[in-house]
A protein has these predicted regions:
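Short acidic low-complexity segments
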Residues: 1-11, 371, 376
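Phosphate-binding loop of NTP-binding sites
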Residues: 7-11, 20-164, 168-178, 233, ...
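Short acidic/histidine-rich motifs immediately flanking catalytic phosphotransfer sites
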Residues: 10-15, 103, 381-384
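Structural beta-sheet core signal
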Residues: 84, 124, 162, 182, ...
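Adenine nucleotide phosphate-binding catalytic loops in nucleotide-utilizing enzymes
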Residues: 131, 137-144, 158-159, 174-286, ...
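Glycine-centered, small-residue-biased loops immediately flanking beta-strands
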Residues: 158, 327, 384
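Active-site beta-alpha connecting loops in nucleotide-dependent enzymes
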Residues: 259, 283, 289-358, 365-371
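A glycine-rich beta-strand to alpha-helix segment
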Residues: 371-402
Length: 409
């Protein structure tokens, strides 16, 4: 559709809200500034929307979209009619936001540019803290300092819920002086998640032991993997912190249908299952592929599109190690997300790095889309799982590949 300064003149908005993806050169943003119209980051809008509600803000380098979606779904299935605004489409709702009539507001808190410091939360969830968005932050230490400020935003009556499997993150939370509840698979946490085998490969289950000693069975019928069981545990902890019925909350979580682009099944063709996933950071990739490895497919094949030159440059060795559980890896060109190319920072460079980390692994770099579909038709076999991964337009590859094979028959 495109953006046009004339839109601002026609609409005459009271305020313009921008996401982190909007550059200062955007014509509508420039026109708003010329007219002295207030310009708010997304998080300031979230803060305004949350006034009068009990606000649950979910943050973390990974898992915040899934966890906030789980919290919103859980509260809704408990008939509490929450409002929510999340960074992904919640399956079963076909939207990323809703204005409910209940007392709770669930907000996904974006740390990418520090704007989550505008929020005024009652409960904060932090799933993890790692090096990312190094186009904005100078170091991991600066990221941790910013998260500490974010966790401090909860008032004296508020609570910080944090994954304590990383003791440093738990220590950071406690340094704020706020009430902290830790969760994780380690028995030292306040809330313990014990994953167990489940008869359906695409499902996951765990036993959650709360601080009062009560245990609850949690079953997730989409989004496999221990990382998603931890996300579900975080949601259950939120219910417990809010004083809600934990058993009813665990039951409600079983109705979670997933988040679009988080291990979303695209389709099946010729014995091949195609899944799409938003993972674009080495830790996310590792977790998703570890979960995929346990699903019983002949091979786990991956098409990966790096997202941002700056991220690839900063984390190239971590990316090189991230694909251990992929049997076959196909790399396509970097999705710039508005960045200018960095000399030498390319998908071909990443291919060389992966080969160095995993000698003998099938790694290909394919620059063109038609060449990609042709290459995949040769690489992917019946019985394989094909995962398209990345935060860019790689999401279109799955449907295109299915169409390609359909028309080829």
């Amino acid at each position: 559709i495109g953006h046009d300064a004339a839109t601002i003149d026609a609409v005459k908005p009271d305020v313009v809200v921008v996401s982190t993806a909007i550059p200062e050169t955007n014509p509508e943003l420039m026109r708003a500034r010329e007219l002295d119209i207030p310009v708010w980051p997304r998080a300031k809008m979230l803060s305004e929307l949350g006034q009068g509600y009990t606000t649950i803000a979910v943050a973390g380098t990974h898992g915040k979209t899934t966890t906030s979606s789980m919290v919103a779904t859980m509260l809704d299935r408990m008939k509490l009619d929450p409002s929510f605004l999340i960074g992904g489409i919640v399956e079963g709702y076909d939207t990323n936001g809703r204005n409910g009539q209940g007392e709770y507001f669930v907000a996904e808190a974006d740390e990418s540019d520090s704007s989550f410091l505008y929020l005024d939360p009652d409960v904060v969830v932090v799933t993890n803290i790692e090096a990312d968005h190094l186009d904005h932050y100078s170091s991991l230490e600066e990221i941790e300092e910013t998260f500490a400020k974010f966790m401090s935003l909860v008032g004296e009556e508020g609570t910080v819920v944090v994954c304590g499997d990383n003791p440093h993150v738990a220590e950071l939370a406690r340094s704020t002086g706020r009430r902290v509840v830790t969760y994780g698979t380690d028995a030292a946490n306040d809330v313990v998640c014990t994953p167990h085998a489940h008869e359906h490969a695409l499902e996951g289950a765990c036993t959650v032991t709360l601080p009062d000693g009560a245990t609850h069975e949690v079953v997730i019928k989409s989004n496999p993997g221990t990382h998603n069981l931890l996300n579900a545990t975080a949601a259950l902890v939120v219910a417990w912190v809010l004083g809600l019925d934990a058993h009813a909350a665990a039951e409600a979580l079983s109705g979670f249908a997933g988040v679009r682009r988080r291990f979303t099944r695209v389709g099946d063709i010729d014995g091949i299952t195609v899944v799409d996933d938003y993972g674009h950071h080495p830790t996310e990739i590792k977790a998703t592929l570890a979960a995929a490895r346990g699903l019983g497919f002949k091979n786990v094949d991956v098409v990966f599109q790096p997202h941002r030159y700056s991220r690839l440059q900063a984390l190239v060795d971590d990316f090189g190690d991230a694909f251990a559980d992929a049997d076959k890896l196909v790399l396509i060109d970097v999705f710039s997300a508005g960045e200018m190319p960095i000399p030498g920072v390319t998908s071909k460079m990443l291919a060389d790095t992966v080969r160095a980390h995993h000698p003998g692994k099938s790694v290909s770099y394919v620059p063109g889309r038609m060449q990609l579909l042709e290459a995949l038709s040769d690489i992917v076999e019946p019985g394989d799982l094909l995962i398209t991964m990345g935060a860019g337009d790689v999401t279109t590859v799955g449907p295109e590949f299915i169409d390609y094979l359909t028309n080829k028959e």
